[in-house]
Design a protein with these regions (language model features):
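Cationic, low-complexity basic patches in intrinsically disordered or flexible, solvent-exposed regions
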Residues: 7, 20-21
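N-terminal pre-Walker A segment at the start of P-loop NTPase domains
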Residues: 41-69
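Phosphate-binding P-loop
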Residues: 70-78
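Conserved P-loop
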Residues: 77-149
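Structural motif
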Residues: 82, 165-169, 214
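Phosphate-binding/switch region of NTP-binding enzymes
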Residues: 84, 201-301
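Phosphate-binding/switch loop-helix module in NTP-utilizing enzymes
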Residues: 143-206
């Protein structure tokens, strides 16, 4: 087991082999034997693990995007989806549209948007164009140049209330704010944020809610994801927003997953931001791409079958 990095209520968070673990224990400095004893309690059989059935009931947005979010449709609970994309492709708009639709489709769902990149004036422009964004709960996080505020503590207190979905724009900017305010390294700031996210994934909050995080992340000039391997490994899915022609901001835009533990990768869903009031998705084009993928898969299967049959016939001829 890795070293204890943070005490949480009646237990502690541990980091080991790229994963976070929570263990209930009041021991602050257990000896070697106790650590080994406690580590053994982490070994389980999944058939013995029990979950609330509601954990596997997804949040529906009422759009075709639900098909990409999960193989059994909708946004799952207690997961981490990271969103990256080319500048100006509409990452914030897509996420705000998604959570606004989920809130509209699922009465009583508690959703929070943490904005570390835009202030109230910036978001007012979004609300004018997409009025339904005005109903969202938003927490603005801005750098405190006076050094009196500690946004990490404020975020911890707010998240402790228990939220179904938390969207962050962006992780890198929030990480930088935490670094400056707490006077720590970027790596430690990342560690603290990851520990916080993992804790709420596992429903360690006042309402025992398995929180889903939608985290927008910045990219390099080449479009590559910014972040450590720890951050990359703990995410459930990587949603990419891309342009057909990266050099032309007016070219067609699409959503595609490059990593997905809950659904398919490589399936494109084209979208349009030109309409006022809502994001529009090209469902017909999406269905056509699915048909083409299925056709390619069937052809590949047939070719493998023919190759296997030929190999068996060839081997039989040699034996005879």
């Amino acid at each position: 087991m890795g070293a204890c990095l943070q005490q949480v209520g009646g237990g502690a968070l541990f980091f080991c082999r790229g994963e976070w673990f929570f263990r209930f224990t009041m021991m602050e400095n257990p000896d070697k034997e106790t650590k080994q004893e406690l580590a053994m309690t982490e070994i389980v059989k999944m058939r013995d693990v029990r979950f609330d059935p509601g954990l596997f009931v997804n949040f529906s947005s009422g759009t075709v995007l639900d098909n990409l979010l999960c193989s059994y449709q909708g946004l799952p609970k207690g997961v981490n989806y990271m969103i990256i994309g080319d500048p100006g492709v509409g990452k914030t708009t897509i996420i705000l549209d998604l959570i606004a639709n989920i809130e509209r489709q699922n009465a009583g769902t508690r959703i929070l948007f943490i904005s570390a990149e835009m202030n109230e004036i910036d978001l007012a422009v979004y609300v004018q164009r997409y009025p339904m964004f005005g109903n969202l709960n938003i927490m603005f996080v801005e750098s405190d140049f006076d050094g009196h505020r500690h946004h990490l503590q404020e975020i911890e207190e707010v998240l402790q209330q228990g939220w179904d979905i938390v969207a962050i724009d962006s992780f890198y900017e929030l990480q930088g704010i935490v670094k400056e305010e707490e006077d720590i390294t970027m790596r430690l700031a990342e560690t603290k944020l990851l520990a916080l996210i993992k804790r709420h994934n596992k429903a360690i909050n006042d309402t025992h809610t398995n929180t889903t995080f939608l985290t927008i992340q910045q990219v390099t000039k080449s479009g590559a994801f910014i972040g450590s391997n720890r951050l990359k490994h703990m995410i459930t899915a990587m949603m990419e927003l891309r342009l057909d022609n990266p050099k032309n901001i007016y070219s067609d835009r699409y959503i595609v997953f490059s990593k997905h533990r809950r659904g398919d990768v490589g399936v494109k869903l084209y979208y349009n931001l030109s309409s006022t009031g809502d994001v529009t998705f090209d469902e017909q084009r999406y269905r056509q791409e699915l048909q083409l993928r299925n056709l390619q898969s069937n052809v590949s299967t047939q070719l493998r079958d023919f190759a296997s049959q030929f190999e068996r016939l060839f081997n039989n001829e040699i034996e005879q």
